[in-house]
C-alpha cells in the first residue's frame, strides 16, 4: 500500500525479498496504490512489485499468489480511469494495466476494491446520497470476469469492502448461471470492527 509513496523501489524490493525468504507467498496490492495517491503516483505499488517480479524471474513468480484490485466509483479518483465503474471497458482496461504494471501474464486473485453501488463503508454511517441511476449488474460483472478467466488473464475473483447482501448476490448469480464464484472477501474485521456480522 505504501510502495511508491513512503517506500522507494529499492526499499520495496528489499522488503519483498525479506518476506519471501521467510515464507510469505501472498502479495496483495491494488491499482490505486500507494495510499495517499494522486494522478502522478497511482499504480506505483504494482509497478514496484512488477519490477521485482521481473528481477526474480518467471520460475519464482509461479510460487507467488498475487492479488490486486480494481477501484470502484465515488472516491474522487477519476484520474485512474473514466468512467470509474465495473463496465466491460473499465474492467478490461484495469486488468490490462495491472498485468502490464505487475509484469506478469496472469493475476491469481482479482478483487473489486469496493462496490459500485453506494453503501455504508470505510466507517461511514448513514448514506447521504443514493444513486438512483445505478442498475443491479452482478450478472454482467461476473460474465465479464468469466471471459477474462477463460482468456487466462485472471485465475480467481473476489470482493473487498462488500456487505453480506453483495456477497449473496454474487454467489446467487454465479450458481444460477454457472459463472465464476467469488473465492475471497477482504473486509475490515476485528474485535473493534464487527460491522460485517450485522448482515449475517
Regions from the PLM with identified roles:
Residues 36-40, 72-88, 118-127:
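Surface-exposed, active-site-proximal loop segments in enzymatic domains
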Residues 7-20, 86-102, 138, 142-143, ...:
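Short, acidic/polar
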Residues 25-26, 63-69, 101, 106-111, ...:
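Structural preference for beta-strand elements that scaffold enzyme active sites
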Residues 99-125:
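Active-site groove signature of glycoside hydrolases
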Residues 1-10, 77-92, 128-136:
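Active-site mouth loops of central-metabolism enzymes
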Residues 1-69, 89, 105, 144, ...:
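N-terminal binding-site loop/beta-alpha segment at the start of enzyme catalytic domains
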Residues 10, 115-200:
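Beta/alpha (TIM)-barrel catalytic core signal, keyed to glycine-rich beta->alpha loops juxtaposed to Asp/Glu
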Residues 2, 31-33, 70-74, 111-116, ...:
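Active-site-proximal loop/turn and secondary-structure-junction residues that shape catalytic pockets
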Amino acid at each position: 500500500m505504501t510502495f511508491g509513496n513512503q517506500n522507494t523501489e529499492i526499499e520495496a524490493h528489499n522488503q519483498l525479498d525479506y518476506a519471501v525468504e521467510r515464507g510469505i507467498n501472498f502479495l496483495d496490492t491494488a491499482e490505486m496504490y500507494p495510499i495517499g495517491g494522486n494522478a502522478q503516483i497511482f499504480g506505483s505499488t504494482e509497478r514496484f512489485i512488477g519490477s521485482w517480479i521481473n528481477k526474480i524471474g518467471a520460475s519464482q513468480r509461479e510460487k507467488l499468489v498475487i492479488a490486486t484490485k480494481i477501484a470502484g466509483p465515488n472516491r474522487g479518483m477519476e484520474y485512474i480511469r473514466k468512467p470509474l465503474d465495473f463496465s466491460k471497458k473499465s474492467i478490461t482496461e484495469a486488468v490490462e494495466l495491472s498485468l502490464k504494471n505487475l509484469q506478469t501474464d496472469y493475476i491469481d486473485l482479482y478483487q473489486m476494491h469496493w462496490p459500485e453501488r453506494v453503501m455504508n463503508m470505510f466507517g461511514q454511517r448513514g448514506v447521504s446520497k443514493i444513486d438512483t441511476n445505478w442498475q443491479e449488474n452482478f450478472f454482467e460483472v461476473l460474465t465479464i470476469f468469466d471471459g477474462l478467466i477463460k482468456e487466462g488473464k485472471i485465475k480467481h475473483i473476489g470482493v473487498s469492502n462488500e456487505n453480506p447482501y453483495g456477497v449473496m448476490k454474487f454467489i446467487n448469480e454465479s450458481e444460477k448461471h454457472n459463472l465464476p464464484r467469488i473465492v475471497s472477501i477482504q473486509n475490515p474485521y476485528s474485535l473493534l470492527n464487527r460491522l460485517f456480522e450485522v448482515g449475517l
